[in-house]
Regions:
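Short donor-sugar binding/catalytic loops of nucleotide-sugar-dependent glycosyltransferases
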Residues: 9-11, 111, 229-233, 260-263
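Short N-terminal targeting/anchoring amphipathic segment
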Residues: 77-84, 93-119, 133-137, 318
Length: 324
């Protein structure tokens, strides 16, 4: 089968991108052909369609998002621009399916969390109109995020996040999400937890590439690398990691955060930077040096995998308030 993955982003080392790669690897091993549709992509261009408007950080999507969250009424112009963008994205989805002769779509979180509302609406309409078989792989639902609680799009959330369609099968990553989906939407789903590939050996942590990580981050030989291997979002509870290191009262302890802020803005990051300064904790954010593969970037810098950082860490902190 020709299978198309659809999301806002397939790039870097965010959870959705990493988990999707695992699915794609298994499907390819079974003889299927895999293709990619997203707004930001680091996949092979030969098997990808990158449409910038599908990315949650596109200016038009930002304009829409600013006017639908934190309020309960939307002007007609907002509805018009949502529909206009959804129509365009639907046409690009049609082109994607036609170009690669796709038999099935796997929608990764784009029908789950409404960071790009027009994309979710476009996917829903496209699936309803074509009856193309599809899987919605749900990583974190909008009702799990406080910032989506007050909104001006209850109609769209009800119909598209996620939709109830006979040709759409749902997959959840844990039982709690599965139960909430059934309770709120009245649809059944399959449970497929996120897993590690234990059969693939890890890279040698003593090799020259991994050994360069500490000095390239500015760490001394006797510094203690404390790793926070998450995005900078409030539910990760990173302030507790900073407090912990402050209580250790050892200037050699450095908190290294592997990922960036993602789709939730910079307010939390600024708060953490201020807290770290007040607590005397050195904070190193290395998101621009993390990739899913080792390589040298266009600036001549080594790019490290998340496993490189794990292997160089002395301690890992993960004080999440809740997880998917």
């Amino acid at each position: 089968m020709n299978i198309g993955f659809v999301s806002t982003r397939f790039a870097g080392t965010d959870g959705v991108s990493l988990e999707t790669l695992k699915w794609a690897t298994v499907l390819e091993e079974q003889g299927h052909q895999v293709y990619w549709f997203s707004g930001l992509s680091d996949r092979d261009p030969e098997v990808s369609m990158c449409v910038p408007e599908a990315f949650f950080g596109h200016p038009e999507i930002d304009w829409i998002s600013e006017r639908i969250w934190g309020c309960t009424q939307r002007p007609a112009i907002v509805t018009e621009r949502i529909n206009e963008m959804a129509g365009y994205l639907k046409s690009m989805l049609k082109r994607f399916v036609s170009q690669f002769q796709l038999d099935c779509l796997v929608v990764e979180n784009a029908l789950t969390i409404p960071v790009n509302v027009p994309l979710g609406k476009a996917i829903t309409e496209f699936l309803a109109e074509t009856n193309l078989p599809a899987i919605a792989h749900h990583h974190d639902f909008y009702w799990e995020r406080q910032r989506f609680a007050v909104n001006a799009i209850p109609d769209i959330l009800d119909t598209s996040f996620p939709p109830r369609l006979p040709n759409l099968q749902h997959v959840c990553i844990n039982r709690q999400a599965q139960e909430q989906l059934s309770l709120r939407k009245g649809v059944s789903s399959t449970l497929v937890p996120n897993v590690f590939d234990f059969e693939t050996p890890l890279a040698d942590s003593t090799d020259d590439w991994a050994a360069n990580l500490r000095p390239e981050l500015g760490l001394a030989e006797d510094d203690i690398l404390i790793l926070q291997p998450t995005r900078i979002v409030p539910r990760k509870g990173i302030e507790h990691s900073i407090k912990l290191i402050s209580m250790m009262e050892d200037p050699r302890c450095k908190l290294v955060i592997s990922h960036s802020t993602g789709d939730e803005g910079y307010e939390y990051r600024h708060m953490l930077e201020k807290l770290a300064q007040d607590e005397g904790v050195e904070l190193i954010i290395m998101s621009d040096r993390i990739s899913d593969t080792r390589h040298v970037n266009r600036h001549g810098q080594r790019m490290f995998t998340l496993w490189d950082v794990y292997q160089q860490a002395d301690l890992v902190t993960y004080p999440s308030l809740y997880e998917g």
